[in-house]
Amino acid sequence: MVSRRRFLKVGAATGSVMTLGWPSVAKIVAAESLNDSNASYPLELTVAGYPFDHVRPLIDGRVQVKGCNTTFQQGKIGDLNTHVFSGPQELEVSEVGLSPFMLAYANEDFSDYSLIPVFPLRLFRHKSIFIHADRGIKRPEDLKGRRIGTPGYSSTSLTWIRGFMQHEYGVKPEDVEWIVSTLDSSAKDAGKVSKQESIVPKGISISVGPEGKDESQMLVDGDVDALFHAAEPKAFTEGHPGIKRLFTDSRATERDYFKRTGIFPIMHAVAMRNDVVDAHPWLPESVFNAYSHAKQMQYEVMRMQWIFGMLPWFGQEFEETRAVMGDNFWPYGIEANRKTLEALFQYSYEQGLAKKRLSVEQLFHPSTLDFTDVS
């Protein structure tokens, strides 16, 4: 029997999807039998995060967490970070920012949650550097000595950007002047900024921008020469002629970066409350497998988007991505992501954000170190 589902803020779309021939509930339940000898079965479990396409089968009930009745609660990353690190910690399973989690562990001895190697959000970040078109900035090296705006400083996305700017182009954090905006034009999507995203290290020049201006307006008004931001600034999305991307063909730049480094930057991971894991040692594997099954279902959906989707070249894009990055281009598990994880941990320590350089094994629950994607 399929376990009961409750839905918070996310509508179920099972009916329309099932008519298109996607993998059925029966197929997934057969792969993950719900028979469980643990006396606590079925465990009431709340999972929080964003309703990404590759998570949606877990949300709408097509995929089950073995041994659990699962509630999915939609949340914004800043709010989820705050809840996990310094809030009521009611969530048993939550999406979190990878860098904030690492900083809480390294700097605050945080140990209430552990990570499992599921990564709901990952993005190449060359596309996330924006410039004022009139400042003569033509290449990354031109950012030396410039004023760069950011909303916050120590988020995962900004750590990645500073990392590849230093290692790929020789532009170190201390080579520029940082201006932190008092507002963020993308706050409605990201939520409140957690403490771990506002760490300011020693040895850099940093100041607060004009009161009442978000990062987008600072760039438009010329208060800064460039902008590092996880989201597209408002002025860019509105087509302001003076706001451009530093990398005009960011797709080609990011593809080349992956081919050379093998790094596909991770933004978010999944954390589980340790007291719950201690009481139910089988739970990390059940949660991991559910996320993995959901992702596999999305791969199947994507294989048919050339006919069912609206984008005219989706099929070609999907095939090209697989050719460059492999069939499982969004892998879960430690070993498939070790190089990427270690790069971020290195950047955080180099940039003076983390007080100590952490290993992968320190952040992820010991039982999950050998987990690999289901196929």
Model-predicted segments: where are they?
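A glycine-rich, aromatic-flanked flexible loop/lid motif
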Residues: 16, 257-268, 312-320
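Short, glycine-/small- and polar/acidic-enriched structural segments
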Residues: 38-40, 44-187
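Short helix-initiation/N-cap motifs at beta->coil->alpha
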Residues: 73-84, 176-217, 362-369
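Secondary-structure end/capping motifs
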Residues: 271, 276-350
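Long, low-complexity C-terminal extensions of enzymes
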Residues: 333-375
